C-alpha cells in the first residue's frame, strides 16, 4: 500500500525545471537584453576614453636623464639615461630624494641636501647632484629653462676646467657656478618686473586708467611670486649658514667635522646670501609701492564717486525747486473758477509766490547738504575748538537757550512780586542767606572733622611707634 502511494506521488511530481524554464517570460528577456546592450555601449565608451589617454612610456617612468661632467670639467655624456633604481643605489640616495631631482616641470621648494657622498641641489630651474669628482645636471622638460641650463653648462665647463684657483675644492667650484646662474636668473627676472611695474606706476600718476590698473594687478601677482621665490632661496641659504653639520657635509674632497673651520665656504654662501637678500628687499619695497599706489587710486576713485553723488543730489535739489515752483501755477491752470481771473495782481502774485517758494526750498536743501558734506571728527570737543570751530547753527542754539533762561528767571520774579508783593524779594533774599549759612556750616563741620581725624591718626601712629620701641 505504501509502495503504491509512493509511486503515485512520484508520477504526479513534476520537475522544477519544467515549471521555471519550460515557458520563459518574454518581458524579462527583453529587459535583460536592454540592460546588456546598455552595458556593452558603456564598455565601448570607456574603452575609447582609455584608448584616447596617452600612456606613460617606460623610459619616462624608469629612467632619468642627465648630463655628466668629470673632474676636469669635460662633458662625459650628454643627456644620458640612467635607471632610477640603480642611480639611487649607486649614490646612496632614498626614493624620496628622487622627487627633488626628477625632471618634471613642477616647481617645488628649493632644497640643498647634504649627503655623505654627494650634494643634491634643487634651485629654480637647476636640479643637480655634485660629487667630489663628478657633477650630474638633470635635464628639464621646460623649454624656457633649457636655455638657462645651456648657459650653466658653459659656466660649469669653464669653472671646473680652470686651474688658476686650486685652493678651492671641486664641489665648491660647482656650487659657486650654480649660485652664479641662479642669481643671474633672479637678476634678469627682477629687472624685467621692476621696469614694467615702475613704468605703470609712472603712467598712473598722470592718468588713472582701467587697463593700466588691470595690467598692474597682473604684474603685481608676478612680482609677488618672484618675491616668494627669492625669499625661499634666502631662507635656504640662511639655514645652511646656521647649520654646522650641513657645512661639514658639503666638504666631499676632504672630510671635515662640525668643529672645524668653514670660513671659505661660509664666505662663499654669505656672498650670494647678501645678493639674494638685496633682491628680496627691493622686491618687497616695490610691492609696498604698488600697494600704496592702489590705496591712493582707491581714494581718488572714492572722491570721484562722492563728487558724482553730490552732482546728482544738486540736480535733484534743482529739480525739486522747479517742481515746487510749478505746483501752484498748475492748480491755477485748471479750467475752473479760482476767483482771481479779473484781478490785476493775480498773475504777478502767483508767479512771485511760486518763485520765492522754489528759491526757499532750494536754499534750505543746499544748506542741509552743505552741513552733511562738512563733517568733522570731533566737532564738540572743547580742546579742539580752535581746530574745529562751532557752526552758526550751534551758536544760535546756545544763545537762544541763554535768552530763555533769563526770560524765565525774570518772569518768575515778576510773578512772585505780583502774587506776594514786595515781601517776595525779602523772602527770596532770606532763603538765599539761609542756604549760604547752611553751606558754610557744612563746610566748617567738614573741616573740624578733618582736623579731628588728623589728630587721631597722629595719636595712633605715636602709639604704634612706642609699642615697636618697647
Curated annotation (Swiss-Prot):
Transit peptide: 1-32
Mitochondrial intermembrane domain ranges by topology: 334-344
GO biological process per UniProt: mitochondrial magnesium ion transmembrane transport
Superkingdom of origin: Eukaryota
Variant or mutagenesis effect after changing residue 309 to F: Decreases Mg(2+) import into mitochondria
PANTHER family to which the protein is assigned, alphabetical: MAGNESIUM TRANSPORTER MRS2, MITOCHONDRIAL, RNA SPLICING PROTEIN MRS2, MITOCHONDRIAL
UniProt protein name: Magnesium transporter MRS2, mitochondrial
Source organism: Saccharomyces cerevisiae (strain ATCC 204508 / S288c) (Baker's yeast)
